[in-house]
Amino acid sequence: LGLVGSEMCIRDRNKAIDKGAFLISTPEVTNIISLDRQKLKRSVFLEKDDPFLIEFTKIAKKKSVWILLGSIVIKDNKNKLYNRSYLINSKGNIQCKYDKIHMFDVKISKKESYKESKIFKPGKKVVVTNTPWGKIGLSICYDLRFPELYRKQVMMGAKLITIPSAFTTTTGKAHWHNLVKTRAIENGSYVLAPAQYGKNSLKRHTYGHSLIVSPWGEILAEKKAGKGIIMASLDFKELHKIRANMPSFRTQILK
């Protein structure tokens, strides 16, 4: 498994492939980061024309790897914008796609607030799909704060949870590691969390710290500073052992 930062996703993808990665993932909003709705409408593409999506489907097919395009901003025929994640299989076909459900509508401080619902149309569908190594559940960034989504995915069979993100520096320092580890532990699942890093605009700095976390909550790999890739091996026998020894999917006492 390899997680690749968006700034270098095209240039450095082969590093992860050459090291044997079977799944490569990029962070949230791989193609463009902007809070300007009109700029996005002018800059992004319809799904069938998006150059990032086209390029990554070609790479997946050529290299026979799976690629999670963490998310890209896409527009539809009605000029509506979506924050959409794509899982591309090793044949270069789109295995599934997921539209971010929970919009980042928050006030962090007097000087820092966000209103994604003014930019994107939220998704409505929980997405879990089959892969050669088991089922994967897709999510994006702010979804991380809503545990019900992940429990639903695990009950649908997910063994891996993907959370491509662009956490702000403020919220990242306070909550990122705790939230990612908690989702892994409470769901007995591997969590893949590639994260945007750096100064994106005058108003927005993203925290980075891409993570790969085990079902026991152990950080298997972390990009602690700067840009780059991280890799880890996933042991699904260990996942099944943890779930058997720590059965947290029993019928709930409280209903």
Model-derived segments and their meaning:
Residues 14-91, 97, 167-186:
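Cys-nucleophile CN-hydrolase/nitrilase-fold catalytic domain and related Cys-dependent amidase chemistry
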Residues 29, 72, 99-101, 141, ...:
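Active-site beta-loop-alpha junctions enriched in small/polar residues
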Residues 69-71, 84-87, 127-129, 210-212, ...:
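Short beta-strand scaffold segments in enzyme catalytic cores
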Residues 48-69, 135, 141-230:
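CN hydrolase (nitrilase-like) catalytic-core segments centered on the catalytic cysteine
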Residues 1-10:
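Single conserved hydrophobic/aromatic residue that forms the stacking wall/gate
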Residues 237-255:
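A short C-terminal boundary segment appended to hydrolase-like catalytic domains
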Residues 76-156, 169-178, 244-248:
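Active-site catalytic loop in hydrolytic enzyme cores
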Residues 30-33, 102-104, 238:
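Feature marks short, surface-exposed loop/turn motifs that line or immediately flank catalytic pockets
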